[in-house]
């Protein structure tokens, strides 16, 4: 049986937030997603970084860059999920700033 859990965490209250999704089957992580987004002064949400498995492997969508490149994470999924959580906590301000610079101005 697959168990799913979704939760959010404020990185900078109330503007910047992270949303996490984790899907576990028989004790193994089978799917995961992390999204970093912020709300602008008009109430519009902007996603500036995302990790998911939409192309088969867990990878990072660098939405804060002009070309919106992808970084592949080759660690086992549970470990990669924790690495991505740490990356977002440590770098969200830089990612948000890059998104604003490259996409809103």
Language model feature labels by segment:
Residues 1-39:
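Negatively charged, low-complexity tracts enriched in Asp/Glu with abundant Ser/Thr
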């Amino acid at each position: 049986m697959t168990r799913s859990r979704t939760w959010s965490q404020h990185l900078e209250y109330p503007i910047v937030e992270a949303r996490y999704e984790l899907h576990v089957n028989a004790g193994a992580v089978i799917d995961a997603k992390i999204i970093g987004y912020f709300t602008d002064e008009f109430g519009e949400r902007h996603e500036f970084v995302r990790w998911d498995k939409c192309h088969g492997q867990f990878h990072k969508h660098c939405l804060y860059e002009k070309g919106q490149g992808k970084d592949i994470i080759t660690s086992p999924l549970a470990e990669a999920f924790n690495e991505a959580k740490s990356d977002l906590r440590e770098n969200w301000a830089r990612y948000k700033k890059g998104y604003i610079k490259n996409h809103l101005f």
